């Protein structure tokens, strides 16, 4: 259940343990029927609220150096779990999170994770490392390392195609579609770009993220995955170097007031 932290809000940590009651199953008489309205290819994610067992959570997002070009570094989260009854153990078949169909703990690599505050998601991603440290027969400490979906884009290759002349946002949309990434409705939030790209061929040597960063460098915009797990693209700042008139005055009115000023000539 959610945990309220004084003066900070109510936090919830949820993890997907791979169980689904409506996932498509090949050759199944009921769950393997094409065009079924009850069973779906990916199924419905079964999120488990594990907040009560969480000892510590840290989230890291954004560039460490704002003066460098974007590197596509994914946002990360680290969850530490106090596991006194070994329900998060990798070998405990009696765990409520044990996936009987797979014969292993449901929390595994690429399983989903999401962290929210007051109902707003701060982080949505996948497990990239899951480690268990047993300190004594009655205590176990589990560390779950997570990354957002930029991690998966970095591990996916672009498909070969000859791009048509188009804006930067349209090119990013095309590349994501070819990669089958962020395909659910509302998962792509793309501003209309300023840069117009040519019809150069897109090869298969670059990762999807690497190519998107090339497009972003042409735009001088921003790409990131938000707390809800949606892909965002912001176009370049327009008009930031335009002349702006500022009026200072000590007589009131709509001007910016001041008390003293210095004139320095070097």
What are these regions (language model features)?
Residues 1-166, 170, 174, 199-220, ...:
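Assembly/oligomerization scaffold segments
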């Amino acid at each position: 259940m959610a945990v309220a932290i004084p003066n900070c809000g109510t936090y919830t940590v949820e993890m997907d343990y791979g169980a689904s009651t409506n996932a498509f199953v090949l050759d199944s008489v009921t769950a393997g029927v094409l065009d079924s309205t009850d069973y779906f290819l990916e199924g419905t994610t079964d999120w488990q609220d594990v907040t009560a067992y969480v000892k510590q959570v840290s989230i890291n997002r954004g560039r460490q150096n704002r003066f460098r070009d974007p590197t596509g570094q994914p946002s990360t989260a680290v969850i530490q779990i106090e596991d006194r009854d070994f329900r998060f153990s990798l070998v405990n078949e009696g765990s409520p999170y044990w996936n009987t169909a797979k014969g292993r703990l449901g929390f595994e690599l690429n399983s989903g994770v999401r962290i929210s505050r007051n109902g707003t998601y701060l982080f949505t991603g996948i497990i990239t490392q899951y480690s268990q440290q047993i300190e004594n027969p009655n205590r176990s400490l589990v560390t779950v390392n997570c990354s957002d979906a930029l991690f998966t884009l970095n591990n996916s290759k672009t498909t070969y195609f000859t791009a048509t002349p188009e804006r930067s946002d349209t090119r990013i949309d095309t590349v994501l579609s070819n990669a089958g990434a962020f395909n659910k409705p509302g998962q792509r939030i793309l501003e209309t770009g300023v840069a117009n790209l040519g019809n150069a061929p897109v090869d298969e040597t670059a990762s999807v993220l690497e190519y998107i960063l090339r497009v972003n460098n042409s735009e001088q915009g921003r790409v990131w995955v938000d707390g809800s797990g949606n892909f965002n693209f912001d176009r370049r700042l327009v008009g930031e170097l335009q002349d702006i008139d500022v009026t200072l005055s000590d007589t009131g009115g709509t001007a910016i007031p001041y008390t003293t000023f210095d004139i320095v000539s070097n």
